[in-house]
Amino acid sequence: MKAVKETLNNVRYAPVSTPLGRLYVAYRGKAVCCVALGSDGRGFERVCERVFGIRPIRDPRLPEDMAKQVLDHLTGRRRFSGRIDLSHLTPFQRRVLRKIRTIPTGQVRSYQWVAKEIGAERAARAVGTALAKNPIPLLIPCHRVVRSDGRLGEYSGGGPSVKAKLLAFEGVDPEDLTRLRSRRKIATGRRRKGGADRPVPVA
């Protein structure tokens, strides 16, 4: 019981206003461990309870450095460079999410590309499953991963409509993705003659 209480006391959360709306951020120490957009405080507590099995403690505001890094990331100033806690995930899930963090703003990749990049070329479906369990959407931008046929696919942070909104916010027109796929502009990880596909900016 003592260990449970200590864990509970170690997970805290607070809201931050962003260009996309109110974002709730949970953290352990200086590491972000869960985020959700457009929720309310009680709803976010339930999200954390599903992920960690506990409810976090609410703070009035995020630590200043953490809030600045979150806002810089969401406004495109710089990629989030703060600490992220993925310790509750499997090694495969962590590999997938770390690779996702390297996808630049305004670009997309396919599930197949991610699978190949982490050395599991036939595991595109498992990549999708790992992304569905992403506890830190936006900061780990799983919305930038789409199907090889140009369709958006699912999104753990609120479904395809939210995914489309996030891509549009970053300058990607979701309606163009199918056309771009027909021109091989969505990186799939498949090899062409003479070398590998290179990821190409969508814009």
Can you name each region flagged by the protein language model?
Residues 1-122, 169-203:
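Basic nucleic-acid-binding alpha-helical/helix-turn surface characteristic of O6-alkylguanine DNA
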Residues 122-164, 174:
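Short glycine/serine-rich loop segments
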